[in-house]
Amino acid sequence: MSAGFRLIDLETWPRREHYEAYFKNTPCTWSMTVQLDVTGLVKQGAKLYPALLYACGKVANRHEEFRMSLDEAGRPGVWDELHTSYTVFHKDTETFSCLWTPYYEDPAEYFAAYQHDLALGRGGGL
């Protein structure tokens, strides 16, 4: 697991013109929706939510474009690795907590870390 953030050199970045056009002139956001067949996961008895968290983490970590962000000074850069963030609802107080689980390439390692973090989050241990 790493937490490195590498600044992008705007002077040499081939996508600078596109970045500036959208960041300065046409600020926007985007979202994506796809149909996804999860039959295999259901047949295996996998828990859908952590499986989807893992899949999103895997895809995001494959593509530099999904790991881009701005630093405190507003300069663009790329994270070496992203980790998953999700919420857990507390029925007794009708509140929720935001949890973070480190991304692991190995699904079994990720799911074990997720279960650990979820148990801590549900018990108020985080």
Task: Report each predicted region and the residues it spans.
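Acyl activation and transfer enzymes in specialized metabolism, enriched
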Residues: 40-64
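Small-residue-rich loop/turn and linker elements
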Residues: 66-100
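N-terminal beta-alpha "docking/capping" segments at the starts of catalytic domains
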Residues: 1-47
